Each structure stands twice: as structure tokens, then as C-alpha cells.
């Protein structure tokens, strides 16, 4: 899909909004969440506009997984957590707020106060 001119993540992808990228690949980038649930809460975002996981082409799946692992490993190495959760909300009924597909990496530490989702 093309970029959506009104989408905040598309604006970040195009460099229209200043951000501190954690990492970047050919088709994905990672930034810290602006309203973190825990210290080190990061987002994995496709550079192209896709609304949900179901819209991301299968041929990008391996890159997305490898990139997610790279970012999670970096967060762990930097001391943000001793474990982590991966969360992806797909559509409003499931809690998606920004309608641009993105994956949350939530570094976890003992006693961080974040309740388990499942």
C-alpha cells in the first residue's frame, strides 16, 4: 500500500516528524512509544502503510520477524528488561488506536506493575 498522508506513522517513515529510531531495515523501523506502558516500550512499524497484520504481504513476514528479534535483543542488551512481551492490536475492537500496523515490544522486569495480557 502507498503511504497515507494523514497517518502519523507514515509521516515518521517519511521523516516529516522528528524521531529517534532504535533500528531500521529495508521495510521496517523501530521507535520508542510516546506513551510507554513500561520503560523501553518500543514499536515495530512497516515503512509502507498497512492497516493490520493481515494486510502485510507474506514476503515481508521473515524480515518483520528478524527485525523484531533484533530490536528485542537490543532492548534486552541495553538493560530495559529481563524478558519481553510482543503485542499487536488489529482493528479498533482489539485496541488498535493508530490504523497503521505496528507491533509493540514490552520489555519486562520483575515487579514492573504491568499485568499479563493472556
Range-by-range predicted roles:
Residues 1-118:
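HIT superfamily nucleotide-processing domains
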Amino acid at each position: 500500500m502507498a503511504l497515507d498522508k494523514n497517518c502519523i506513522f507514515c509521516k515518521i517513515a517519511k521523516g516529516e516528524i522528528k524521531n529517534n529510531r532504535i533500528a531500521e531495515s529495508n521495510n521496517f523501523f523501530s521507535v520508542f512509544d510516546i506513551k510507554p506502558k513500561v520503560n523501553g516500550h518500543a514499536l515495530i512499524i512497516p515503512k509502507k502503510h498497512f492497516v493490520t497484520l493481515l494486510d502485510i504481504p507474506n514476503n515481508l513476514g521473515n524480515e518483520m520477524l528478524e527485525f523484531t528479534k533484533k530490536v528485542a535483543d537490543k532492548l534486552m542488551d541495553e538493560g530495559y528488561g529481563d524478558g519481553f512481551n510482543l503485542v499487536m492490536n488489529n482493528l479498533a475492537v482489539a485496541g488498535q488506536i493508530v490504523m497503521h500496523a505496528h507491533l509493540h515490544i514490552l520489555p519486562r522486569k520483575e515487579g514492573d506493575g504491568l499485568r499479563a495480557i493472556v
